[in-house]
Amino acid sequence: MALIRILRCGVTGSLGFGLICLACLFAGDAAYSTDSPDEMFLNGLQGNWMMVGTLGGKSVRYRADGERVLQGGFLKLHMIDIDSPPQYEADAFLGFDPKAGDYIAHWLDRFGAAGARVIGQGKRNGEQLVISFPYADGAFRDTFTWRPATKSWALLLESQASNGAWSTFASYTLTHRALQ
């Protein structure tokens, strides 16, 4: 009702409407802060990375690029293997929900929509973030660990068997790479 009154006031209404738009813009920014420790943790994944490790016991190498997207609401980690043509490509979207006090993750890859139905949730403890994905065929657990001494990340992907036992699916180390 107040907005309608402001709009009916002509020039003053335009000014009032502009002020309301600015207030909404700043209120939206207040909900997302890159300064919180949880957002700063995700910010550590920004940049260009070489991702080396094992997948199913075989050596693999990927390029990974981390950047803030969707007006900073998510950290996107784009991963693509260095084979030509690439055999695997994925985007992981990681975000922190300050109201719930947890992280959420969407893992989208070349295998399509079926795997994208599941949203991962997790908690951070110090330099380690563990995200669980409750897939119908068995849960997955992704553990991101920041290693300050080497300025690198470890990423451990584990799958859960029907008996509840966890096993390593993939393991990677991410180190900064120079742009070419």
Functional labels for PLM-detected ranges:
Residues 30-180:
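Hydrophobic small-molecule pocket/channel-lining residues, especially in calycin-type beta-barrels
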